[in-house]
Every structure is written in structure tokens, then in C-alpha cells.
UniProtKB/Swiss-Prot annotation:
Pfam families per UniProt: YbeY (PF02130)
Cofactor requirement: Zn(2+)
Family the entry assigns: Belongs to the endoribonuclease YbeY family.
Organism: Francisella tularensis subsp. tularensis (strain SCHU S4 / Schu 4)
GO biological process: rRNA processing
Entry-linked InterPro entries: MetalPrtase_cat_dom_sf_prd, YbeY, YbeY_CS
Name assigned to this protein: Endoribonuclease YbeY
Chain sites annotated for binding Zn(2+): H123, H127, H133
Keywords: Cytoplasm, Endonuclease, Hydrolase, Metal-binding, Nuclease, Ribosome biogenesis, rRNA processing, Zinc
Described purpose of this protein according to its UniProt entry: Single strand-specific metallo-endoribonuclease involved in late-stage 70S ribosome quality control and in maturation of the 3' terminus of the 16S rRNA.
Keyword hit for Membrane: no
Subcellular location: Cytoplasm
UniProt keyword Calcium present: no
Amino acid sequence: MKRKLKMDNLNINFINDDEHPIPSQDLLLKCLQLVANKHHISHAEVNLNIVSNDEIQQINKQFRNKDKPTNIISFEFEKPQGLPDDIANDFLGDIVIAPAVLENEAKEQNKELNDHWQHIFIHGLLHLLGYDHQDDQEAEVMENLEIQLLAQLGIANPYIEQENQNGR
């Protein structure tokens, strides 16, 4: 199933061929709106691919050299030479999410599934905007921004339990 969801000049192209269960698409569009507003982006388009654990494991192995399923992988758009700016500037990239991984994580971490979806989608959007967490300083910047954005949605800090477990 392919569906385009649009709010003003913000678009999410949902690609969910196997019709995996996903939360309200309006929730995810609200996440895009928050991230876009925070970064003063007036036009944005994202592809959101919903896949199985097997599919995301293959993608994870191919692009990250990790042979295991993961919750999300983001691919920032790289503008091909010759593509007009007015076409390329709006497209942020592709996000791939495995709903079964999110469901398991939400259960293990005692989180509401919709809250976890919104957190992970925001996390992926931030990757598309160049944020990363390769070192502790980058991780802190990205996590703090996620916490701020999630608070605007009424979602608690998703890192509290992890911080306590990891001693961070």
C-alpha cells in the first residue's frame, strides 16, 4: 500500500506493501511538522518505508555491516548533479522502520507503542537533517533535541530508563 499524507507543504510518502500495522499517520505527520518548525523548514518530503524484520536486517547488513534487525534506518537524500534545486531541496530522504522491532522494544521498555513510534520517527527525521550519535557529544545533542520535541507531544523522556541502566 502506498499513500501520501500531506499537511501544508509537508509530505510523508508511506510505503507499506505488506500492510504492517502502524500508528495513526496523522501522529507521524505531526512529528514531521514539529521537526520542520524547529529547523525553520517550510517544505519537506520524506519517504517512510514500513518493512519486516527480515527486510530491515538485510538493509542493516548491506548498509551498516550489522547482521541483525534494527528499529530504524535513515538515508539522507544526496542531490544528484543537475537536479534543479526547487525539486531537490524539499526531499529529505528515506526512513525505513520495522514495526515488529518497535513493538518488541515498547514492550521491553514499558513504553506506549504510539509514543515509541513517534520517538523513533523523530529520531530518523533528525538523522535526515544531519544529526548523528557516533560519539557521546553528538548523542547528547541529538537526544536532548528528541526530548524537547517529544515533550511538545506530551511524551516523557524516553532515555530516563536507559540513562539509569547505562549510568549516563
